[in-house]
Design a protein with these regions (language model features):
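Generic N-terminal helix/loop capping motif
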Residues: 13, 17, 56-59
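Active-site pocket-lining segments that scaffold enzyme catalytic pockets across diverse folds
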Residues: 1-16
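Acidic-glycine-rich active-site phosphate/pyrophosphate-binding loop
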Residues: 17-36
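SAM-dependent methyltransferases
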Residues: 169-204
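Thiamine diphosphate
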Residues: 3-6, 30-179
């Protein structure tokens, strides 16, 4: 199963006002291809994708928040699953794309290549709706659970490899965070950024 196939199925089910947080690397670029939106927050550093999504879900309980994480990324901050279970935001949906490797820096195997089961870890933390997806049919079934209330954790076993993608320098991550923050300001009618007389992206 390829990650792009999964993301394509997920993109078809995502609403315009869903907030989507991605990890760094191939997931980010593929999601940008499928669903370019100011409601996307890209390139969360290792270990930070699920925690940032958790914070958003708690701050905006009326908005659905979707985390697009990876096995290597999540393994660096497994305690975040305990935090998710403790707080139990009903609007948080976590999809982990598990290729059993740290693909971006060269394909070194991750712990899931040696038997570590992220679904069992999530269940052990108390996230009852934790499911594997080993083929596209199973993944489609997990996507159908998006509309149900409660934390959702899906670990999708995927192949290594990605579609042809734009180079990293075509995405301005600082500007993306600014766009995301102003999108939240506009849609929630709440201040996020301190008022400035000039944009930080036009100052010399």
């Amino acid at each position: 199963m390829k990650r792009f196939e999964c993301l394509k199925a997920l993109a078809a089910a995502v609403r315009d006002d869903d907030l989507v947080v991605t990890n760094l690397g191939n997931t980010m670029h593929e999601w940008l291809t499928l669903r370019p939106s100011r409601a996307n927050l890209y390139n969360m550093n290792l270990g930070q994708c699920t925690p940032v999504a958790l914070g958003l879900a708690l701050a905006l309980p009326h908005r659905r928040v979707i985390a697009l994480d990876g096995d290597g990324n999540l393994l660096l901050n497994l305690v975040s699953l305990a935090d998710v279970s403790h707080r139990k935001p009903a609007n948080l949906k976590i999809f982990v794309f598990d290729n059993e490797a740290y693909e971006s820096p060269g394909g070194m195997p991750s712990a899931t290549a040696h038997g570590v089961d992220l679904v069992q870890i999530a269940k052990g933390c108390g996230i009852d709706r934790s499911f594997p997806a080993t083929n596209l049919e199973e993944f489609d079934q997990r996507v159908e659970l998006l509309d149900q209330s409660g934390v959702l954790f899906v670990n999708a076993k995927i192949e290594m490899g990605s579609i042809e993608r734009p180079p990293y320098n075509e995405i301005d991550f600082k500007f993306n965070k600014y766009q995301f923050a102003t999108y939240i300001e506009e849609t929630e009618k709440k201040p996020v950024l301190r008022l400035r007389s000039r944009s930080p992206f036009t100052e010399k």
